[in-house]
Swiss-Prot record:
Residues 26-221 are lumenal. This is ER membrane protein complex subunit 10. It is linked to Neurodevelopmental disorder with dysmorphic facies and variable seizures: An autosomal recessive disorder characterized by global developmental delay apparent in early childhood, mildly impaired intellectual development, speech delay, behavioral abnormalities, and non-specific dysmorphic facial features. Some patients may have seizures, brain imaging abnormalities, mild skeletal defects, and renal abnormalities. PANTHER family: CHROMATIN COMPLEXES SUBUNIT BAP18-RELATED, ER MEMBRANE PROTEIN COMPLEX SUBUNIT 10. Glycans are attached at residue 182. The lineage of its organism: Eukaryota, Metazoa, Chordata, Craniata, Vertebrata.
Length: 262
């Protein structure tokens, strides 16, 4: 009997270990997958742990046309709301072109797909974009801030870029200061606008109606409440203000009789 009980216990433990093993493997795989993808997302969706990738592109052309190329990759953890960015270094040709665009007062543009994880423009549902004067980016030594605005569905609805410090003052910038971007990223979640106090108003109205139903006496008019006091007062005033017609008639008759005796 004891041997059978021990065998059943061992079998139960083996079953529990078999059930727990896949869940541990899934958890470790989620963490490992996130670390392995990292900066290599290239706009692809990180399937595990609620992390998605966004491709960051930029454009700066002499003729001010839009010709977007990859600048880096954004990694958005939708569970904790964190945003990270990995960027590549500008080539010598790109640094020279950026200087030329800045000298011509041209624009530096950035864009991000609206739908995280999209592979192309059609799947992305379009792009959101922003721009700054190229000269301000050059004089800031490629120091800028990107802010992503997202909605409740997890789509990107806007992006803004600002340089630190901003403005174009004509300062000389060495070529070594235009190799690496110094970028801070910020995620702007949706804000809930205050709605009308419809529920509170309805609740207050129902409470008032319930209170009136409990005290129907309060719904009566002033006359309905105090008629038993008002009617006697009105009758008293009517009786006290009426002329004494009987007394006046008796006096007139006596005077007439005296005159006829003479």
């Amino acid at each position: 009997m004891a041997a059978a009980s021990a065998g059943a216990t061992r079998l139960l433990l083996l079953l529990l270990m078999a059930v727990a093993a896949p869940s541990r493997a899934r958890g470790s795989g989620c963490r490992a997958g996130t670390g392995a993808r990292g900066a290599g997302a290239e706009g692809r969706e990180g399937e595990a742990c609620g992390t998605v990738g966004l491709l960051l592109e930029h454009s700066f052309e002499i003729d001010d046309s839009a010709n977007f190329r990859k600048r880096g990759s954004l990694l958005w953890n939708q569970q904790d709301g964190t945003l990270s960015l990995s960027q590549r270094q500008l080539s010598e040709e790109e640094r020279g072109r950026l200087r030329d665009v800045a000298a011509l007062n041209g624009l530096y543009r950035v864009r991000i797909p609206r739908r995280p994880g999209a592979l192309d423009g059609l799947e992305a549902g379009g792009y959101v974009s922003s721009f700054v004067p190229a000269c301000s980016l050059v004089e800031s030594h490629l120091s800028d801030q990107l802010t992503l605005h997202v909605d409740v569905a997890g789509n990107v609805v806007g992006v803004s870029v600002v340089t630190h410090p901003g403005g174009c003052r004509g300062h000389e910038v060495e070529d070594v200061d235009l190799e690496l971007f110094n970028t801070s990223v910020q995620l702007q979640p949706p804000t809930t606008a205050p709605g009308p106090e419809t529920a509170a108003f309805i609740e207050r109205l129902e409470m008032e109606q319930a209170q009136k139903a409990k005290n129907p006496q309060e719904q009566k008019s002033f006359f309905a409440k105090y008629w038993m006091y008002i009617i006697p007062v009105v009758l008293f005033l009517m009786m006290s203000g009426a002329p004494d017609t009987g007394g006046q008639g008796g006096g007139g008759g006596g005077g007439g009789g005296g005159g006829s005796g003479r």
